[in-house]
Amino acid sequence: MSRYRGARLRIVRQFDLKQTLRGLTRKRTDNRCMPGQHRKKRNDSTKKTKNSKKVAQYQIRLQEKQKLRFNYGITESQLINYVRQARKTKGSTGETLLQLLEMRLDNIVFRLGMAPTIPAARQLVNHGHIVVNNKKVDISSYQCQSQDVISVTKNKTIRTLISNFINSKTPKNLLRNPQIPSHLIFNKSTLLGTIKSVVPRRWIGLKIKELLIVEFYSRKA
């Protein structure tokens, strides 16, 4: 399954989220109808069947998995690989999975406030504008470690672009830039960020039930 490149608010409406997928889009929406031509109501009654409970449980797990995938902008195969990697690590599989995704370079650039969304941060990385420990890294899935130093290349145009975004006022129709989490340090004047430690669970950039995702992949990954 390829990476999603379609309408982003459509995904937010699909999940009926009161808070948007912050990594995917900054835009707000008050439209609570399902996306599509006929705008199906969410509370429409459906006939109960013997398998309705089983289907409902599967649907809940699937939705949590899709929320995670869309927020971080990863493919299905990438997510499966992260789940397998998390299982090999000691501790909670769900929490380790979230930490692996949070420590991706594109997400770190986003959480430092240098880009409005994770896709925008991924562009900065892929185009070679991000430096890790004084070495240019153009792989968005690069796994950052504690004490890594993240900076921007000496390209004046890019540095000006990032500085203007950081210092700009947020329009009313967009969400404000999120607070920089406790495990990161960022100097706005030098555009220099440092990773102090692995991200704590309470600073994960998405409200999600990771246990449901682990259960979803219990027989697949």
UniProtKB/Swiss-Prot annotation:
Name of a matching Pfam family: Ribosomal_S4
Keyword Protein biosynthesis belongs to the record: no
GO MF entry, a single one: structural constituent of ribosome
Superkingdom in the source lineage: Eukaryota
Biased composition regions of type Basic residues, renumbered to the chain: 37-53
Region annotation Disordered: where it falls in the sequence: 26-53
Subcellular location(s) of the protein: Plastid, Chloroplast
Positions of disulphide bridges: none
GO biological process: ribosomal small subunit biogenesis; translation
Residues in S4 RNA-binding domain copies: 103-161
Alphabetical UniProt keywords: Chloroplast, Plastid, Ribonucleoprotein, Ribosomal protein, RNA-binding, rRNA-binding
GO cellular component, as recorded: chloroplast; small ribosomal subunit
Nucleotide-binding is among the record's keywords: no
Signal peptide range in chain numbering: none
Complex and partners: Part of the 30S ribosomal subunit. Contacts protein S5. The interaction surface between S4 and S5 is involved in control of translational fidelity.
Homology family: Belongs to the universal ribosomal protein uS4 family.
Task performed by this protein: One of the primary rRNA binding proteins, it binds directly to 16S rRNA where it nucleates assembly of the body of the 30S subunit.
Protein name: Small ribosomal subunit protein uS4c
Organism: Pleurastrum terricola
Source species taxonomy: Eukaryota, Viridiplantae, Chlorophyta, core chlorophytes, Chlorophyceae
